[in-house]
Design a protein with these regions (language model features):
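Soluble non-cytosolic domains of exported or imported proteins
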Residues: 34-44, 103-110, 127
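Active-site-proximal alpha/beta segments of enzymes that process anionic O-linked groups
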Residues: 1-9, 112, 118, 131-136
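Metal-dependent active-site segment of extracytoplasmic phospho-/sulfohydrolases and closely related
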Residues: 39-83, 90, 116
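…; additionally, a secondary subgroup of soluble metalloenzymes is captured
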Residues: 121-129, 138
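Loop/turn elements at helix/coil->beta-strand transitions in domains of secreted/extracellular proteins
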Residues: 9-15, 59-65, 88, 95
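Solvent-exposed loop/turn segments at secondary-structure junctions
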Residues: 21-25, 71-74, 96-98
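Substrate-binding rim/cap in mid-to-C-terminal beta-strand-loop elements of soluble/periplasmic
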Residues: 81-123, 134
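Active-site His/acidic residue clusters
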Residues: 3-45, 49
Length: 138
């Protein structure tokens, strides 16, 4: 709720909202469990509130939404070295994004920072190994 209120009143170019609930439910209850999916449903409602706040602030046409996670999970684990633990969802939405686009190639977490740098027109530092996911843009 506080995020939506902040969005409506603050002047901002970049907002990162971190929600840690799934990071607690996964290791405690297990990934791919009813309680984990219930928490995802709750978080989906929060995302809806944030989108509505952006609309109410009159900034929808100027906003890019990115929803992702810092890691995946297996059973009651908390990240790890398997692909299932390293790959996460990466959802990006904006009027300049191809609607319904699905990545055919592997996308890793470090590609998120590269994509954000690309969005803001920033030069990626040479030491970064990420690739900007420019194929999602129209």
């Amino acid at each position: 709720k506080w995020a939506g209120e902040y969005i409506k009143v603050a002047s901002w170019e970049w907002v990162k909202i971190v929600v840690g609930e799934t990071d607690h439910v996964g290791p405690a209850e297990g990934h791919e469990t009813p309680s984990y999916y219930e928490k995802l449903k709750e978080l989906d409602g929060y995302i809806g509130q944030i989108i509505q706040a952006v609309k109410d602030a009159g900034m929808l046409d100027e906003t890019i939404f990115i929803v992702t996670a810092d890691h995946g999970g297996i059973k009651k684990g908390h990240g790890g070295k398997t692909m299932e633990e390293m790959e996460t969802a990466f959802i990006i939405a904006d009027k300049g994004i191809k609607k319904g686009y699905e990545f055919q190639e592997s996308m890793m977490q470090f590609d998120c920072a590269s994509t954000i740098a690309y969005i803001f027109g920033l030069k990626q530092p040479q030491v970064w190994i990420g690739r900007p996911m420019i194929q999602v843009f129209k």
